[in-house]
Amino acid sequence: MIDEQTEKRRGSFWRELPILLGVAILVAVLVRAFVLQTFYIPSPSMEHTLNVWDRVLVNKLVYDFREPRRGEIVVFKAPTDWQSGAEGEDFIKRVIGTPGDNVVCCDEQQRLKINGQSLDEPYIYTDADGTRNQVADQEFNITVPPGRLWVMGDHREASGDSLEHYEQSTATDEAGKIDDATITIDSVVGRAFTVFWPASRATWLSVPEGYDAIPDAAGK
């Protein structure tokens, strides 16, 4: 025989269930909107750090408290002239230069130099026969404007990034070319910090050690 208290508890549970589900849905929506969001990788531009169809988790809150840092992988809303499809298209690239940084290609060993310090980039794409992408396919010497970022894909030869848009810019002056090639910090959605799918590729997306040696930009 079921006692009266048990019946009351069961009845209370079923009455509260819709409220609990509603709260759970609201929390999930708020987390997705303001804290964490998943993204899939649609192109080879970040191989082999990120492969096509990898799923990454993005922290959307971190840049409310600080600016993006060199070496971090960020998701951002692509500038209009970067887009190939729908308006508001999301891109994912690695931050190479932050405001005030002088980014130069290249030193004697064909490495980028940031604020006078050469940068080792072991993550740059290498194909099946061991041929490594060039760091860049042309020389350049730029200073990142305030409020903007210079971003590049790890698969340099397959990435529509700051270098490509610098090369393709139709601006008639250097400042205009750099504006065309950089993205605004305000356009950054968040930092990709882990690959979580497929499970065989699960890993943290930490900042490579080479960035530790880069000095601050002049005046910082």
At which residue positions do the language-model features occur?
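Soluble "head" domains of membrane/secretory-pathway proteins
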Residues: 2-14, 18-19, 30, 34-40, ...
